């Protein structure tokens, strides 16, 4: 008996499915959201497919059930009706409350099923859900810098598949590995480690992004034990580490942590490697000096170690093809016995012959010692005997150190006026010798709105510039020192300078500032200083002459003492330094005429004529030695010569010769250079760059400028230029043998020069000084702009006189 069919409610699974579908269309998602809409449509299609499968199963059951009607047919019909109602409501974009839907399902009248069997519905294919497209994952592993992904289509059992393979980028390597994401990168790393000696940490260094693209700073490299050992010993040289650093426990552990099998040896082996590195760099420098086309200017100086060992330091200077000033230390020898002129000359000549540059010398800069005078005389004779072809028979060879001259002049002047600054020395010593008194001074400085971090320098007997620095700092803290005296008169009244003494200190400070600025300017080694000597020394001479008639007696006494020493060295100064000033297009001959008229009065023309003869003699020497010396013919006449060679008419040929002789203009680079107006330039001026751009216009004068401007007017760097006690070799190196000391100092200088501008390596002899002195030079230039204007006015007056007009 068939049970009655009524309004049966839908099954629980259908209700849960309907609730899930309704929640996907909650009121909070009424805004058009494509993602959730696609998801709801997918659930709808799955529900319809499930309902269709249920109907098929029930139909098959009825077909095998002897014509009995399934009691659940009405239930299936109600479920199908319920799903259609929910789908229609979702399609209309309306939200349905799940509780209301349940009530509607319960009370909705259901149609009565008929007893006849229902036709079996055809099974509907289940629609496939469209999967959202995924963004391709970016390869972040460093192995892909050495492999390239390629897609390969393969066929398996009649079906085609796409496989991804990674091919090695190294030349002549055909290795490839599966590159799908689930395969990983271990195989790639193992291949790089075993076949190409690349391990983790060496594959790629940090990269930077430029316009969205990764740019590697360096390329992968193969580990080289020889290169690593060279870097280690180069670090010992450049940073002046002790040799036994290779035996330090924690340093060895550090190296072993980087590479356990690194062959770090003992200090004896380190010394051997350093000597080998020195010989290697020496051979490179020898080949480089062989190709230099210009002449060399040299400096020779004596150094002292803590064990009183004397060393001779010989440095060569030249201007390369790019018109950059170069310098190299070519000798650092231990000189035994007395430093006689003969011994010094023999050592210097041996060094020049050793480097094969004895025939390319131009000048030698030395200190003002009696032994050096004898040494220079012997060196010139030795070089002439070897046919070294010295310029003008050595007339420009000996150059006296300008900084040493200024040092001697300043010391003689300070020795006379030492008593006038005794109180300043006393009060500076008082506040610096006690921390409590220094704190009191700094408290007074704060009350006067002064910079407490500036500090006060103290006077040192062997450094004349320390007196200048002490006066500068004391004058800066003058308000604080006066305030300190007022707060404790019992302690400071006797040692604090009076108002008149402060005025005297200010006057001395202004006088010494001229010496300080010029010494700092002429001590540079990174720029040409030869063209700055003549103008600077003329300014000093002019100032000393003015101080000799100063209203204050103390200044006059100081000026007289300075004048005696200055005149002694001014008379024997090298004429080549005046030539260097002549080669400065801002001054030429006009500046020399200006100062000669100022110093010699009406007889200045005699001195100017002597100077011009020296210039012409130097020009003739280079003209005779230059294989490419220009001829005194114009370009038009040269083209005429070519025409004459091709012309067979003798009469016409003679006529052309007559025309050429008639309008031929004898041209001379020297006369052309002197006839051109002065270069108007303010601020810093790069004289080497200026001559570099005039090579085609003045081929002979540029050769002269290239040799003359390489002259060093100082034998020391700025940090030791003010010392009267000489230079001292580093105490950590003085126990080493002279051979290894030379290797360390020379190699450091050569390597640092080859890396010029990349890294600064502090050195014991100051070979790589910073160009801070250029700022002082610019300030000094501004202070003397009036004199430069006088020189230009003097030039204009001369031109007016030459043209027949009155000034």
Swiss-Prot record:
<feature type="region of interest" description="10 X 2 AA tandem repeats of P-[QE]">
    <location>
        <begin position="109"/>
        <end position="128"/>
    </location>
</feature>
<keyword id="KW-0238">DNA-binding</keyword>
<feature type="repeat" description="2">
    <location>
        <begin position="111"/>
        <end position="112"/>
    </location>
</feature>
<dbReference type="GO" id="GO:0032196">
    <property type="term" value="P:transposition"/>
</dbReference>
<feature type="repeat" description="5">
    <location>
        <begin position="117"/>
        <end position="118"/>
    </location>
</feature>
<dbReference type="GO" id="GO:0006310">
    <property type="term" value="P:DNA recombination"/>
</dbReference>
<dbReference type="InterPro" id="IPR025525">
    <property type="entry name" value="hAT-like_transposase_RNase-H"/>
</dbReference>
<keyword id="KW-0815">Transposition</keyword>
<dbReference type="InterPro" id="IPR008906">
    <property type="entry name" value="HATC_C_dom"/>
</dbReference>
<feature type="repeat" description="3">
    <location>
        <begin position="113"/>
        <end position="114"/>
    </location>
</feature>
<feature type="repeat" description="6">
    <location>
        <begin position="119"/>
        <end position="120"/>
    </location>
</feature>
<dbReference type="InterPro" id="IPR052035">
    <property type="entry name" value="ZnF_BED_domain_contain"/>
</dbReference>
<dbReference type="GO" id="GO:0046983">
    <property type="term" value="F:protein dimerization activity"/>
</dbReference>
<feature type="repeat" description="1">
    <location>
        <begin position="109"/>
        <end position="110"/>
    </location>
</feature>
<dbReference type="InterPro" id="IPR012337">
    <property type="entry name" value="RNaseH-like_sf"/>
</dbReference>
<feature type="region of interest" description="Disordered">
    <location>
        <begin position="42"/>
        <end position="140"/>
    </location>
</feature>
<dbReference type="Pfam" id="PF14372">
    <property type="entry name" value="hAT-like_RNase-H"/>
</dbReference>
<dbReference type="Pfam" id="PF05699">
    <property type="entry name" value="Dimer_Tnp_hAT"/>
</dbReference>
<feature type="repeat" description="7">
    <location>
        <begin position="121"/>
        <end position="122"/>
    </location>
</feature>
<protein>
    <recommendedName>
        <fullName>Putative AC transposase</fullName>
    </recommendedName>
</protein>
<keyword id="KW-0233">DNA recombination</keyword>
<keyword id="KW-0814">Transposable element</keyword>
<feature type="compositionally biased region" description="Pro residues">
    <location>
        <begin position="110"/>
        <end position="125"/>
    </location>
</feature>
<feature type="region of interest" description="Disordered">
    <location>
        <begin position="785"/>
        <end position="807"/>
    </location>
</feature>
<dbReference type="GO" id="GO:0003677">
    <property type="term" value="F:DNA binding"/>
</dbReference>
<feature type="repeat" description="8">
    <location>
        <begin position="123"/>
        <end position="124"/>
    </location>
</feature>
<feature type="repeat" description="9">
    <location>
        <begin position="125"/>
        <end position="126"/>
    </location>
</feature>
<keyword id="KW-0677">Repeat</keyword>
<feature type="compositionally biased region" description="Polar residues">
    <location>
        <begin position="84"/>
        <end position="98"/>
    </location>
</feature>
<feature type="repeat" description="10">
    <location>
        <begin position="127"/>
        <end position="128"/>
    </location>
</feature>
<feature type="repeat" description="4">
    <location>
        <begin position="115"/>
        <end position="116"/>
    </location>
</feature>
